[in-house]
Amino acid sequence: MKDVIKDLSELRMSYEKGELHEAQVDTHPHEQFLQWFNHALQSNLHEPYAMSLATCNRQGRPHVRTVLLRGATAQGYDFYTNYDSQKGIDLAENPYAELLFYWPSLERQVRIGGIVNKISEHESTDYYHKRPRDSQIAAHISTPQSGIIANREELQQRFNRLYEQVGQQTVLSKPEFWGGYRLQADYYEFWQGRPNRLHDRLSYQNTDGTWVVQRLMP
């Protein structure tokens, strides 16, 4: 184990692909996010819309996992899940959360923090029916999410049973326990890797409706 730690201590790289200056960023953080996000999409990265979602329960215990961004507007950032999942339980107890996008090949990272609320049932249903058929079925049978299951075979059997039951049914109803959340941002941080660990970090803080940009120590 000591050899592994020693090896890890020697692993490092220099970041030299970009710079981040106050005079060059958009005055609104969502517009700045869209610039970086679109660049990530155009760079053909693997799932640039994947993001880490950090939540915390009322005892202060954090939980983090990777989810997919399914909507991004000035009103907020959307993701979908089982309401009875750990993230759903956490958000019912403590609605504050953070998102983290990390694009290593671009040497960029974005943090977005704020309060999370459920989106409308209409929006959730509309998105659910846009999902592939198999994904719709999976949403029905993978509950309670994070619950213990005996083995993979049991999960597959559940899927197969519902698949046979619905057959060619054109419309599969959205489960009541499944839907979307929207994070309304009040904080952003944009990180650009730089040489010698002197990274560029710019934060946006919403103060009385105005976004204030500040440079942070690396």
UniProtKB/Swiss-Prot annotation:
Q: Give the enzyme's EC designation.
A: 1.4.3.5
Flavoprotein in keyword set? yes
Q: Where along the chain is substrate bound?
A: 12-15, 70, 127, 131, 135, 197-199
Give the enzyme class.
oxidoreductase
Reactions this protein catalyses: pyridoxamine 5'-phosphate + O2 + H2O = pyridoxal 5'-phosphate + H2O2 + NH4(+); pyridoxine 5'-phosphate + O2 = pyridoxal 5'-phosphate + H2O2
Which cofactors, if any, are listed as required? FMN
Q: Write out the pathway annotation from the protein's UniProt entry.
A: Cofactor metabolism; pyridoxal 5'-phosphate salvage; pyridoxal 5'-phosphate from pyridoxamine 5'-phosphate: step 1/1; Cofactor metabolism; pyridoxal 5'-phosphate salvage; pyridoxal 5'-phosphate from pyridoxine 5'-phosphate: step 1/1
A GO BP entry is:
pyridoxine biosynthetic process
What GO molecular functions are on record for this protein?
A: FMN binding; pyridoxamine phosphate oxidase activity
Q: Where does FMN bind?
A: 65-70, 80-81, 87, 109, 145-146, 191, 201
Instruction: Tell me the keywords, alphabetical order.
Output: Flavoprotein, FMN, Oxidoreductase, Pyridoxine biosynthesis
Q: Which InterPro entries match?
A: Pyridox_Oxase (IPR000659), Pyridox_Oxase_CS (IPR019740), Pyridox_Oxase_N (IPR011576), Pyridoxamine_oxidase_dimer_C (IPR019576), Split_barrel_FMN-bd (IPR012349)
Pfam families linked: PNP_phzG_C, PNPOx_N
The free-text cofactor remark is: Binds 1 FMN per subunit.
Subunit description: Homodimer.
Summary of the function given for this chain in its UniProt record: Catalyzes the oxidation of either pyridoxine 5'-phosphate (PNP) or pyridoxamine 5'-phosphate (PMP) into pyridoxal 5'-phosphate (PLP).
Q: Which PANTHER family match?
A: PYRIDOXINE-5'-PHOSPHATE OXIDASE, PYRIDOXINE-5-PHOSPHATE OXIDASE
What family does this belong to? Belongs to the pyridoxamine 5'-phosphate oxidase family.
Q: Which NCBIfam families does this chain map to?
A: pdxH, PRK05679.1
Question: Know the name of this protein?
Answer: Pyridoxine/pyridoxamine 5'-phosphate oxidase
**Organism the protein comes from:** Acinetobacter baylyi (strain ATCC 33305 / BD413 / ADP1)
The beginning of the lineage is: Bacteria, Pseudomonadati, Pseudomonadota, Gammaproteobacteria, Moraxellales
